[in-house]
Amino acid sequence: MDGQTLRKAERSWSCSREKKEGYAKDMVTDFDEKHDEYLILLQQRNRILKHLKSKDPVQLRLEHLEQGFSVYVNGANSELKSSPRKAIHSDFSRSASHTEGTHDYGRRTLFREAEEALRRSSRTAPSKVQRRGWHQKSVQIRTEAGPRLHIEPPVDYSDDFELCGDVTLQANNTSEDRPQELRRSLELSVNLQRKQKDCSSDEYDSIEEDILSEPEPEDPALVGHPRHDRPPSSGDWTQKDVHGEQETEGRSSPGPDTLVVLEFNPASKSHKRERNLSAKRKDNAEVFVPTKPEPNLTPQAPAVFPDQERMCSRPGSRRERPLSATRKTLCEAEYPEEDASAVLQAIQVENAALQRALLSRKAEQPASPLQDAEGPPAKPWTSLLEEKEETLELLPITTATTTQEPAGAAGGARAINQAMDRIGLLGSRQQQKLLKVLQAVESDSAHLGRVVSPTKEQVSDTEDKQRMRADEIKDAIYVTMEILSNWGNSWWVGLTEVEFFDLNDTKLYVSPHDVDIRNTATPGELGRLVNRNLAGKKDSSPWTCPFHPPLQLFFVIRNTRQLGDFHLAKIKVRNYWTADGDLDIGAKNVKLYVNRNLIFNGKLDKGDREAPADHSILVDQKNEKSEQLEEAMNAHSEESKGTHEMAGASGDKELGLGCSPPAETLADAKLSSQGNVSGKRKNSTNCRKDSLSQLEEYLRLSAVPTSMGDMPSAPATSPPVKCPPVHEEPSLIQQLENLMGRKICEPPGKTPSWLQPSPTGKDRKQGGRKPKPLWLSPEKPLAWKGRLPSDDVIGEGPGETEARDKGLRHEPGWGTSRSVNTKERPQRATTKVHSDDSDIFNQPPNRERPASGRRGSRKDAGSSSHGDDQPASREDTWSSRTPSRSRWRSEQEHTLHESWSSLSAFDRSHRGRISNTELPGDILDELLQQKSSRHSDLPPSKKGEQPGLSRGQDGYSGETDAGGDFKIPVLPYGQRLVIDIKSTWGDRHYVGLNGIEIFSSKGEPVQISNIKADPPDINILPAYGKDPRVVTNLIDGVNRTQDDMHVWLAPFTRGRSHSITIDFTHPCHVALIRIWNYNKSRIHSFRGVKDITMLLDTQCIFEGEIAKASGTLAGAPEHFGDTILFTTDDDILEAIFYSDEMFDLDVGSLDSLQDEEAMRRPSTADGEGDERPFTQAGLGADERIPELELPSSSPVPQVTTPEPGIYHGICLQLNFTASWGDLHYLGLTGLEVVGKEGQALPIHLHQISASPRDLNELPEYSDDSRALDKLIDGTNITMEDEHMWLIPFSPGLDHVVTIRLDRAESIAGLRFWNYNKSPEDTYRGAKIVHVSLDGLCVSPPEGFLIRKGPGNCHFDFAQEILFVDYLRAQLLPQPARRLDMRSLECASMDYEAPLMPCGFIFQFQLLTSWGDPYYIGLTGLELYDERGEKIPLSENNIAAFPDSVNSLEGVGGDVRTPDKLIDQVNDTSDGRHMWLAPILPGLVNRVYVIFDLPTTVSMIKLWNYAKTPHRGVKEFGLLVDDLLVYNGILAMVSHLVGGILPTCEPTVPYHTILFTEDRDIRHQEKHTTISNQAEDQDVQMMNENQIITNAKRKQSVVDPALRPKTCISEKETRRRRC
């Protein structure tokens, strides 16, 4: 017995010594001490576990939300996989079934559970700092549709580069020798284990395992290496190479279903190692930079995480092993210089192995999904291989070819040793199972290598062919026209039109936005060069610009339909021609370049008087193709170099972040003949690829044979017509059938549309309807729904198709910017993927967008190409947390574009109006260009809808989805319009409209001969008979109303026909249709129409949704319905603008509307009843009060004289009865008596007397100079009182001046210069004078009114009172005044003025100009009297101060004097018909309109200075006899062509100040009334309750010495009185 015991002890000692040598660990420990320590540790762990398992309600709720079906927008669980479901902790349960001892099981399980609990307690999502209670592990769910989804957290991009050092040392572990070495080592380990089994009894088995598994602090395998060189942690050894990276992302193994994880359950030894490996790096944990990540080549040592602090305490005799989280500093020298072909070869090898394994797994996969969850024994070796490879996918391809390097070999050997260390700790059963797996791997590795390993030369050749093929699909063609001379005009050059045709002789659309010019400061209207006949027959004038040879015109013809054979075949140039123009302006010698190739160098014909000269230029295809090939080769060379540098230096930072395949970067590498899926095996960087099970599910759904690479590579030629038949381009449903393999609708031999080639690196748009979420559509494979013709090269399999979709088309219409320069396309394709191609929320891209109530979900601009069951790629995750500036700007511009309601339906010509704040070829351009020529599934709608956008409102009929070729026609022609109403906005019983407006291509309202409806109106119901809401109300012109007398209402029955038929008087081209929806009230607005179809002479011209009215009278026009445009011709739109009554309506014009009907809340209890509720038309009293007219005053009996207004006499007496306000003094500056011929009669001092005579009659005055003789001294325009007459004034008494002529004279009137000493003293001037001649009163009973002096000498302020003028005023009838009980003041009026001000002097104070600090001017002005008639003005009526530029020193003879303001030549840019004056320091420029009689003005028209618009008036005020009646801003003259919306105002020739309430005048001047609402808004900025005051920059004082000289002196100025 003792001998046997001794032999066992010796054998145990020998085994212990061998293991101590193999693993460099000291295993000699006393059993009793070890057992006691284990019990203590077990108690401590149990306490910790109990504490950790107790969760508060917040943690429970977080766990429920974060581990369930919730997919958060922050990226925590956004990636989906379809791997078979496994239990997350199935390794624990499997550990319990092992035959090891109870102590070993309990210890192992507790350690693992405690470790998991500690890990969970230190997590936070989704950033680097983990949230408590959030353990970011893989989650497996099963949807209602059946497929399983594997959701796992994303890999963080920013930390990938830090692992490059590790990966360089560990990349060789993937070689074919590794399974062999590992198997040999494992056989040795198994034999050793068997010896150990033989040496010890069953009782001591678990004890010895415990002894062997307890490490010592001096473990050389751990202490001697940094973090990345440590032995593997718990979990499968195959994860060792990437475990640090996975922990960086807060995630465990790649998938809980991995066989190695389930089988290689660690012993207790792995606890500390697991702690070391799971101590998450915290470098930059608090910093999150939402921009494009840059590789950190020298990462700092990470900080210690709380996991390290929470380690359970050990007995005092034990020493804690230090945690080392320090990472090896990376050095650029570690990266070998590799060729891009080597990278591609490595990708081919991986892809081939992956495809082979996947197909084998698919063939042997168990039928029952539950069988997969039972465990590894049920899986074939191919499944094990797949799962094994899945754990190695994060190794970068850039280091896959470094097996020759000694460092790589050493790293591989070290990895094998470390794996054996881990395997040695396993039980014998586990080691035996692993050995079987490795034998199976080794036996088939050679076969896989023979099948899938191409040579470098083959890969390189394939790469060149692929690049050439991909580049055959062009983004755009660039045409340059160089004009060297014209036919003789020395100043101008012009062209009528330039047209481009493709190989099918189809005219190619060119946006005006894509036309540019160089070498001229004034480009002219470049949009006139292209698409002149697009919108209508009426063409604008030809394009002209100043000629400074050589002049270069640039055209960009975009491949909007992504045709594979997109080439330019012919260019037609139409030279300058007008019927009466100078044909010498036409271009003569020109050069034409197509993509930098000269195709034409010659003369263009000169047009004759009958027709323009057309010149067709054929494009040589050889030049174009050779240049294209050259570009492709250059791009290939540069790309290879760039790939070589990026792979070696920056950890393939620019290779699409692993989510965009190298196939994309290297011109879309296609599948080999064996069908390897290079697109799926796309991970050439340090980030994770999608799971194999997802690809398997993807291939299963698509049902496409793997030999797709053998398909013919010729691209399908798209037909030239705009709307090809359905059979030529399959719809989305047909594409889906192709992918499913159920039905093939395409002709035999035709390449499927989803495999048609398209340009590299360019976003694709989708026109399909968005699919429902996966859980709502169990029968449809949503991974393929909604895709357009793919951008894949012919021959790609579905896996590569998916990969390219993810790399290129994550959010088409919002992300990637297109490279305009073809030469830069390959390089830009690599950088745009991770910076721009991102979904802002990283949700499943096919998510449903919420309906807005007005518009349905947009299924184009916001949709993506991969389905809900496809996991989002890594760039999605990163970009979702780093929104890029470019995508944000494109979103902003997209929102701006949507706000262009009415014009956006036809964006082809209006796209250039949007501010070009993005780089050329930005995403907005691409969005618009794509949709201008593409087939859209649903008809492009009216305003607010982009062409090609389809709307997915719930109630919308999807009948047009199958057709997919409807587009709103341009200017449809016909005579009968039928509006078919499909649905309402919610009312189940009634449907109604407020009005319908139709405009023709002439800009005029269409004359309607008949209108009828079916059903006609609600009078067909039994309870009605005389309801006023009939169909004829739709065309009565009253649309913005809530009055029942002007609306139409009819019964509505779901499923039946409801239509309105309108017959035009004459057939015409329809340019605009406006639908005013039912607007009775907010509640009743749900009776408005929703989905309609319009037919014009049986041609469908519109199908879509009409916006619901607001139910109020306030708001913008789009709040009342919708406007549908059928043209974008600027001339037609401007003509419509001027005849459109909609823009006349404002709050002031709504006074004729009825009060809103008193709303009775409808009953809600009969929601399911079929009984139609009763509706009653409002019968409120009419608010309009009849306008009364005052009878005109009877004329005063006229005094009979031989000549009216001419009186003869000798003694003239003037009696002054009132002053302008002074109660003590009255005075005058000068007086003249006007003779019959208008001359001043001579008056001498002895002929004139006064009573009182002067101030000297007062006691306090004795020698005052203001005597009577000053009235006739001839000095009248003055402010010196020694030239004025002043007398004491007593109200109510007579103050008489008597003039006795030497003989009888014919007197026509008087001329006064009132008292003008100062502005304050002007109130001493005379106001009322009664005149008599020889005792006969010749003045009106109230006397003559004398104008008050101005108080300055800015103009000759003489007032000429002619007797005849007063006789005419008495004979003319007074205008009728309207008595109205309510105010008619318009809400848009920006001033409160007396109605029709009356006065003598209308003074315009010009406060500022539009920018010129030295000059200010006007072109013209007109004043209208109370009857709306223009007041004739002469030079005596107009004056200015300063007078003109002639007032400047050294300037004389300038013709821009004030009289030009009234020369009737106003709509001009000729400076000879304008007024210009200098701006002098300290002075306000003034323009005076002076009248001798009180004049009532109803309207003033102003023409701003047009010659130099910045010298025009900006801020000004209007004073009438020194009373301010208006101030505002006069718009600067603009030569731009306007539009129809308020956001793009048309060119207004003049601006109007309205004082009248006459509706006719207001209607006539509706477009020119000055409105300053925007400028009058006062905005106050606040920040944290603090008012922010932006200190305005002090305006610098203008130096008069720097004033530029200006003078126009073509004709002599006429003499003026002042």
Curated annotation (Swiss-Prot):
Quick check: keyword Coiled coil in the entry? yes
**Alphabetized UniProt keyword annotations:** Cell projection, Ciliopathy, Coiled coil, Cytoplasm, Cytoskeleton, Joubert syndrome, Phosphoprotein
Q: Where in the cell is it found?
A: Cytoplasm, Cytoskeleton, Cilium axoneme; Cytoplasm, Cytoskeleton, Cilium basal body; Cytoplasm, Cytoskeleton
UniProt-annotated stretches for the region Disordered:
1-21, 84-106, 119-138, 212-260, 616-691, 706-727, 743-899, 932-963, 1154-1176
Q: Which coarse location class describes where this protein primarily resides? A: cytoplasm
Spell out the Basic and acidic residues composition-biased ranges: 238-250, 801-812, 821-837, 858-878, 888-897, 934-945
One Pfam family matching this protein: DUF4457
BP GO terms, sorted: cerebrospinal fluid circulation
Give the coiled coil ranges.
613-643
The PTM Phosphoserine maps to 453, 660, 691
User: Which GO cellular component does the record give, naming just one?
Assistant: nucleoplasm
* Highest taxon in the source lineage: Eukaryota
Tell me, in a sentence or two, what this protein's role is: May influence the stability of microtubules (MT), possibly through interaction with the MT-severing katanin complex.
Quaternary structure note? Interacts with microtubules. Interacts with 4 subunits of the katanin complex: KATNA1, KATNAL1, KATNB1 and KATNBL1.
**Which pathological condition is tied to this protein?**
Joubert syndrome 26: A form of Joubert syndrome, a disorder presenting with cerebellar ataxia, oculomotor apraxia, hypotonia, neonatal breathing abnormalities and psychomotor delay. Neuroradiologically, it is characterized by cerebellar vermian hypoplasia/aplasia, thickened and reoriented superior cerebellar peduncles, and an abnormally large interpeduncular fossa, giving the appearance of a molar tooth on transaxial slices (molar tooth sign). Additional variable features include retinal dystrophy, renal disease, liver fibrosis, and polydactyly. JBTS26 inheritance is autosomal recessive.
Q: Which PANTHER family does the annotation name?
A: KATANIN-INTERACTING PROTEIN
Q: What is this protein called?
A: Katanin-interacting protein
State the species of origin: Homo sapiens
Chain's gene name:
KATNIP
